[in-house]
């Protein structure tokens, strides 16, 4: 009888355990990130600390080039502008003698040509700005957006074997999705001309125009009687340029609030980092460091004037440094 009782007890325990649902492993919100302290800081901030922030104040700002999309050797804006310059020369060969058109031709042949990349400014003339401003001068704004979208989604980028439109970092796209799932409002804020972001972001990563902040090229309105108004691109920009503190001016003017999270990849994003660091809510600032020469490129996190003490700034302000080589398990959206 004792043996029967023991057997019944064992069977009861086995039955109860078999009926009890097994714990389900939580879904990893950042599967393309390696298991590091950086990933733990991100999941702790977004999954835990963000609960202390009212939903209407959960605002995150991201740079674009070099932060969520590749910018080396050519970023989206300059790739499209170069093609525009080449097509102008085909229509008017006399333009070929001008320096900015010569630069565009050189980069179309060799995107890493240092005779161009290291000499944008000559005798006080910024030929990078010249290429960008002249490439689609007097073009209808919406027509340009369609042109740029077609070019970026059909033209293969150097080195990667993918079209430009696929050169988004998979880990960063996961981070954007994770933030959205936790009720964050996200804005892309970079020095890139706003028109370039409008051409690729809505269809590629699902960001509508209302969430894009960039340098605004001047537009001249035209009001035809038989169709909707059009806006013609001019060779100038509306100030301030969306870089450094210009980003913060545009963020505050547009949003009217201080964000709680900022992510960038150059010292030009330090302004955004300083801004979020003043928030009364839990906040986070992170720099993506390009140190992976095998899967992408290695380059310093500044443009123009060297900033050798950039890591000191990160350390002093408790900003995060995310090294691509260590943090990204996978780099590209559609390719390992």
PLM regions and their residue ranges:
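Bacterial N-terminal signal peptides that target proteins for export
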Residues: 1-7
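Bacterial N-terminal signal peptides
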Residues: 7-16
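A generic hydrophobic-helix recognition signal that picks specific residues
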Residues: 11, 56-60, 183
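Non-catalytic pre-domain segments flanking phosphatase-related domains
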Residues: 18-64, 72, 79, 86, ...
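C-terminal cap/substrate-recognition subdomain and adjoining C-terminal extension
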Residues: 22-29, 33, 41-43, 47, ...
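Short, solvent-exposed loop/turn and secondary-structure capping segments
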Residues: 71-74, 79-82, 199-200, 275
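A metal-dependent, Asp-based hydrolase signature
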Residues: 74, 79-165, 170
């Amino acid at each position: 009888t004792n043996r029967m009782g023991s057997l019944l007890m064992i069977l009861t325990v086995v039955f109860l355990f078999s009926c009890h649902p097994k714990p389900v492993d939580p879904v990893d919100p950042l599967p393309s990130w390696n298991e590091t302290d950086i990933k733990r800081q991100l999941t702790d901030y977004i999954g835990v600390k963000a609960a202390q922030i009212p939903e209407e104040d959960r605002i995150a700002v991201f740079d674009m080039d070099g932060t969520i999309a590749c910018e080396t050797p050519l970023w989206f804006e300059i790739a499209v502008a170069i093609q525009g310059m080449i097509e102008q020369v085909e229509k008017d060969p006399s333009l070929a003698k001008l320096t900015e058109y010569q630069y565009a031709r050189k980069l179309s042949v060799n995107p890493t040509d240092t005779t161009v990349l290291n000499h944008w400014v000559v005798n006080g003339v910024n030929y990078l700005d010249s290429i960008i401003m002249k490439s689609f001068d007097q073009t209808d704004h919406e027509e340009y957006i369609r042109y740029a979208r077609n070019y970026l989604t059909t033209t293969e980028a150097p080195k990667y074997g993918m079209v430009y439109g696929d050169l988004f970092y998979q880990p960063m796209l996961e981070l954007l999705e994770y933030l959205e799932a936790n009720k964050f409002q996200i804005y892309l804020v970079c020095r890139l001309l706003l028109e370039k972001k409008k051409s690729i972001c809505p269809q590629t990563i699902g960001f509508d125009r209302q969430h894009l902040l960039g340098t605004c090229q001047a537009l001249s309105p035209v009001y035809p009687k038989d169709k909707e108004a059009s806006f013609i691109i001019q060779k100038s920009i509306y100030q301030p340029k969306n870089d450094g503190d210009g980003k913060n001016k545009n963020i505050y003017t547009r949003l009217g609030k201080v964000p709680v999270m900022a992510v960038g990849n150059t010292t030009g994003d330090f302004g955004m980092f300083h801004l979020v660091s003043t928030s009364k809510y839990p906040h986070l600032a992170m720099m993506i460091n390009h140190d992976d020469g095998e899967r992408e490129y290695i380059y310093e996190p500044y443009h123009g004037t060297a900033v050798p003490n950039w890591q000191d700034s990160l350390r002093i302000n408790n900003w995060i440094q995310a090294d691509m080589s260590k943090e990204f398990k996978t780099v590209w959206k559609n390719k390992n």
